[in-house]
Amino acid sequence: YSPAPMGRKDVLIEGDKVIKIADRIAGDYSELNVKTVEAEGKTLVPGFVDQHVHVIGAGGEAGFATRTPEMQISNIVKHGITTIVALHGTDGTARNIEALYAKTCALEEEGITARMLTGSFEMPSATLTGSVRRDMIFIDKVIGAKTAISDRRSSQPTKAMVEQLAAQAYTGGLAGGKRGYTHIHLGVGARKLSMLKDIIRETEIPP
Protein backbone atom coordinates (compact mmCIF):
# COMPACT_ATOMS: atom_id res chain seq x y z
CA TYR A 1 0.00 0.00 0.00
CA SER A 2 1.33 3.44 -0.95
CA PRO A 3 -1.39 4.45 -0.02
CA ALA A 4 -3.44 2.60 -2.69
CA PRO A 5 -3.02 -1.18 -3.00
CA MET A 6 0.02 -2.06 -5.15
CA GLY A 7 -0.25 -5.83 -5.00
CA ARG A 8 2.67 -8.13 -4.26
CA LYS A 9 6.01 -6.29 -4.60
CA ASP A 10 9.69 -6.51 -3.73
CA VAL A 11 11.03 -3.56 -1.73
CA LEU A 12 14.67 -2.50 -1.60
CA ILE A 13 15.69 -0.44 1.43
CA GLU A 14 19.06 1.26 1.90
CA GLY A 15 19.68 2.63 5.37
CA ASP A 16 16.41 4.31 6.34
CA LYS A 17 15.16 5.01 2.80
CA VAL A 18 13.06 3.01 0.35
CA ILE A 19 15.18 2.87 -2.83
CA LYS A 20 12.97 0.80 -5.12
CA ILE A 21 9.60 -0.93 -5.27
CA ALA A 22 9.08 -3.40 -8.13
CA ASP A 23 7.42 -6.68 -9.01
CA ARG A 24 10.80 -8.37 -8.66
CA ILE A 25 14.17 -6.99 -7.59
CA ALA A 26 16.90 -9.38 -8.70
CA GLY A 27 20.66 -9.17 -8.40
CA ASP A 28 23.77 -10.64 -6.85
CA TYR A 29 24.17 -9.04 -3.44
CA SER A 30 26.36 -11.78 -1.97
CA GLU A 31 29.31 -9.44 -1.44
CA LEU A 32 27.19 -6.82 0.28
CA ASN A 33 25.81 -6.72 3.80
CA VAL A 34 22.24 -7.36 2.73
CA LYS A 35 19.45 -8.72 4.91
CA THR A 36 16.51 -10.40 3.17
CA VAL A 37 13.15 -10.37 4.94
CA GLU A 38 10.58 -12.85 3.67
CA ALA A 39 7.26 -11.04 4.14
CA GLU A 40 4.97 -13.46 2.31
CA GLY A 41 1.40 -12.98 3.52
CA LYS A 42 2.18 -9.76 5.36
CA THR A 43 1.06 -6.21 4.61
CA LEU A 44 3.57 -3.40 4.04
CA VAL A 45 2.32 0.15 4.52
CA PRO A 46 3.97 3.57 4.90
CA GLY A 47 4.53 4.79 8.44
CA PHE A 48 1.36 6.13 10.05
CA VAL A 49 0.86 9.81 10.91
CA ASP A 50 -0.58 10.72 14.32
CA GLN A 51 -1.71 14.35 14.36
CA HIS A 52 -2.50 14.52 18.09
CA VAL A 53 0.25 13.37 20.44
CA HIS A 54 0.89 14.67 23.98
CA VAL A 55 4.62 13.97 23.88
CA ILE A 56 5.39 15.75 27.16
CA GLY A 57 2.39 14.24 28.89
CA ALA A 58 -1.07 15.60 29.61
CA GLY A 59 -3.71 15.30 32.29
CA GLY A 60 -3.28 16.96 35.65
CA GLU A 61 -6.93 17.98 35.88
CA ALA A 62 -7.25 16.42 39.35
CA GLY A 63 -3.93 17.58 40.76
CA PHE A 64 -0.25 16.98 40.14
CA ALA A 65 -0.45 13.23 40.77
CA THR A 66 -2.80 12.82 37.79
CA ARG A 67 -0.29 14.15 35.26
CA THR A 68 0.64 11.58 32.62
CA PRO A 69 4.34 10.96 31.90
CA GLU A 70 6.43 12.09 28.95
CA MET A 71 6.18 9.80 25.94
CA GLN A 72 9.12 7.67 24.80
CA ILE A 73 9.85 7.03 21.13
CA SER A 74 9.49 3.27 21.66
CA ASN A 75 5.81 3.78 22.51
CA ILE A 76 5.33 5.60 19.21
CA VAL A 77 7.14 3.43 16.69
CA LYS A 78 5.92 0.09 18.04
CA HIS A 79 2.49 0.99 16.64
CA GLY A 80 3.86 1.81 13.17
CA ILE A 81 3.78 5.58 13.69
CA THR A 82 6.68 7.42 12.07
CA THR A 83 5.32 10.98 11.93
CA ILE A 84 3.72 12.88 14.81
CA VAL A 85 2.34 16.32 15.59
CA ALA A 86 3.03 17.28 19.21
CA LEU A 87 0.67 19.53 21.15
CA HIS A 88 -0.33 20.68 24.60
CA GLY A 89 -3.27 19.35 26.56
CA THR A 90 -5.20 21.26 29.20
CA ASP A 91 -2.10 22.43 31.05
CA GLY A 92 0.11 24.85 29.14
CA THR A 93 1.58 26.37 32.30
CA ALA A 94 3.34 23.62 34.25
CA ARG A 95 4.14 22.07 30.86
CA ASN A 96 5.46 25.01 28.89
CA ILE A 97 5.83 25.56 25.16
CA GLU A 98 9.63 25.46 25.36
CA ALA A 99 9.50 21.92 26.78
CA LEU A 100 7.15 20.89 23.98
CA TYR A 101 9.55 22.26 21.36
CA ALA A 102 12.54 20.55 22.98
CA LYS A 103 10.76 17.18 23.07
CA THR A 104 9.67 17.58 19.45
CA CYS A 105 13.29 18.17 18.44
CA ALA A 106 14.45 15.21 20.53
CA LEU A 107 12.02 12.82 18.84
CA GLU A 108 13.21 13.93 15.43
CA GLU A 109 16.82 13.37 16.48
CA GLU A 110 15.81 9.85 17.57
CA GLY A 111 14.59 9.04 14.07
CA ILE A 112 10.95 9.97 13.43
CA THR A 113 9.41 13.01 11.75
CA ALA A 114 8.10 15.37 14.43
CA ARG A 115 6.24 18.68 14.17
CA MET A 116 4.26 20.67 16.74
CA LEU A 117 1.44 23.11 17.33
CA THR A 118 1.96 26.35 19.20
CA GLY A 119 -0.56 27.45 21.82
CA SER A 120 -2.70 25.40 24.20
CA PHE A 121 -6.08 25.56 25.93
CA GLU A 122 -4.95 28.91 27.31
CA MET A 123 -5.64 32.22 25.60
CA PRO A 124 -3.79 34.38 24.75
CA SER A 125 -1.68 31.58 23.31
CA ALA A 126 1.65 30.66 24.85
CA THR A 127 4.23 30.98 22.06
CA LEU A 128 7.97 30.69 21.50
CA THR A 129 8.48 34.05 19.78
CA GLY A 130 5.74 36.27 21.19
CA SER A 131 3.03 35.61 18.60
CA VAL A 132 1.44 32.71 16.76
CA ARG A 133 2.29 34.32 13.43
CA ARG A 134 5.98 34.65 14.29
CA ASP A 135 6.10 31.04 15.51
CA MET A 136 4.60 29.93 12.20
CA ILE A 137 7.09 31.92 10.15
CA PHE A 138 10.32 31.45 12.08
CA ILE A 139 10.07 28.12 13.95
CA ASP A 140 10.47 25.34 11.41
CA LYS A 141 8.74 22.68 13.51
CA VAL A 142 5.61 24.76 14.20
CA ILE A 143 2.93 23.97 11.59
CA GLY A 144 -0.20 25.25 13.29
CA ALA A 145 -1.88 26.50 16.46
CA LYS A 146 -4.15 24.96 19.08
CA THR A 147 -6.97 26.18 21.28
CA ALA A 148 -10.16 24.80 22.86
CA ILE A 149 -13.82 25.77 22.78
CA SER A 150 -17.09 24.51 24.28
CA ASP A 151 -15.20 23.04 27.21
CA ARG A 152 -15.15 23.94 30.91
CA ARG A 153 -11.34 23.61 30.86
CA SER A 154 -10.85 26.13 28.05
CA SER A 155 -10.07 29.81 28.51
CA GLN A 156 -13.57 30.58 27.24
CA PRO A 157 -12.23 32.46 24.20
CA THR A 158 -14.53 34.83 22.37
CA LYS A 159 -15.27 34.40 18.68
CA ALA A 160 -12.98 37.33 17.91
CA MET A 161 -10.10 35.67 19.79
CA VAL A 162 -10.49 32.41 17.87
CA GLU A 163 -10.75 34.33 14.60
CA GLN A 164 -7.50 36.14 15.35
CA LEU A 165 -5.75 32.90 16.31
CA ALA A 166 -6.86 31.18 13.10
CA ALA A 167 -5.88 34.21 11.02
CA GLN A 168 -2.40 34.33 12.55
CA ALA A 169 -1.88 30.61 11.96
CA TYR A 170 -3.10 30.92 8.37
CA THR A 171 -1.18 34.06 7.39
CA GLY A 172 1.92 32.88 9.22
CA GLY A 173 1.65 29.65 7.28
CA LEU A 174 1.48 31.56 4.01
CA ALA A 175 4.63 33.52 4.84
CA GLY A 176 6.43 30.47 6.21
CA GLY A 177 5.49 28.10 3.41
CA LYS A 178 3.32 25.87 5.62
CA ARG A 179 -0.28 24.71 5.75
CA GLY A 180 -0.92 26.94 8.76
CA TYR A 181 -3.95 25.25 10.30
CA THR A 182 -5.77 25.69 13.60
CA HIS A 183 -6.38 22.58 15.72
CA ILE A 184 -9.41 23.11 17.93
CA HIS A 185 -10.28 20.88 20.88
CA LEU A 186 -14.07 20.63 21.13
CA GLY A 187 -15.63 19.89 24.50
CA VAL A 188 -19.15 18.80 25.37
CA GLY A 189 -20.47 22.30 26.09
CA ALA A 190 -23.90 23.40 24.88
CA ARG A 191 -22.42 25.75 22.25
CA LYS A 192 -20.82 22.79 20.45
CA LEU A 193 -19.62 23.84 16.96
CA SER A 194 -21.68 27.03 16.73
CA MET A 195 -18.67 29.35 17.07
CA LEU A 196 -16.74 27.59 14.31
CA LYS A 197 -19.74 27.61 12.00
CA ASP A 198 -20.08 31.37 12.54
CA ILE A 199 -16.38 31.92 11.82
CA ILE A 200 -16.54 29.90 8.60
CA ARG A 201 -19.66 31.78 7.49
CA GLU A 202 -18.58 35.29 8.48
CA THR A 203 -14.83 35.45 7.75
CA GLU A 204 -12.54 34.91 4.78
CA ILE A 205 -10.36 32.37 6.61
CA PRO A 206 -10.40 29.12 4.59
CA PRO A 207 -11.98 26.21 6.50
In which residue ranges do the predicted regions lie?
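Distinct, well-ordered alpha-helical segments
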Residues: 125-133, 159-164, 190-203
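Histidine-rich, glycine-flanked metal-binding segment
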Residues: 1-45
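Metal-associated gating/positioning segment near the N- to mid-region
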Residues: 36-102
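Active-site core of metal-dependent hydrolases
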Residues: 153, 167-207
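Hydrophobic faces of well-ordered beta-strands that scaffold small-molecule active sites
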Residues: 47-51, 84-86, 114-118, 141-149, ...
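Active-site mouth loops of central-metabolism enzymes
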Residues: 54-67, 118-124, 152-156
